[in-house]
A protein has these predicted regions:
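Nucleotide/phosphate-binding catalytic cleft detector across ATP-hydrolyzing
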Residues: 1-20, 26-146
Length: 146
């Protein structure tokens, strides 16, 4: 038992970066040990689907289908036993910010609202507020993920 406590465990995180040209799923794998800072084990696995979610403003269900395809791919990388402990976030950037500016917040929120049920049903750890439009000032803080 002591040996198991000393062994670092793998932990995962899934970040959906919904940009203007497409949505990228980033699957991060960390070394996690209680009391230690998690360490990234390798470059994240990344898959991009185009176009950006804002292209589906008039058909939000298509945005949900795009997110669903990315989630299915991420599920192949995260062991089934770890999915419930793996957070998934959907961070929308320039495309949905522009949609909100041009057609109103409700148009952008409708796209996110269509995607939330996919994330809830994904087997990953998700809360509704983890799918949101990232303010431009905060976007730079996530540049390391690209």
């Amino acid at each position: 038992m002591l040996h198991a406590l000393l062994q670092p465990a793998s932990a995962y995180a899934v970040v959906l970066d919904a940009g203007s040209s497409g949505t990228r799923a980033h699957v991060f794998r960390f070394q996690a040990r209680p009391g230690h800072t998690p360490m990234l084990l390798a470059k994240p696995s990344v898959l991009k689907h185009s176009p950006g979610l804002s292209a589906f403003a008039d058909q939000p269900a298509k945005a949900a289908r795009q997110v669903e395809a990315l989630i299915h791919w991420a599920q192949t990388l995260v062991p089934a036993g770890q999915r419930r402990d793996t957070p998934v976030v959907l961070l929308a950037t320039a495309g949905l910010r522009l949609l909100a500016a041009q057609r109103g917040e409700a148009a952008a929120e409708a796209v996110l609202d269509a995607c939330r049920p996919v994330l809830i049903d994904s087997q990953f750890l998700f809360r509704d507020d983890w799918a949101h439009i990232l303010p431009g000032a905060d976007e730079g803080a996530f540049a390391w993920a690209r």
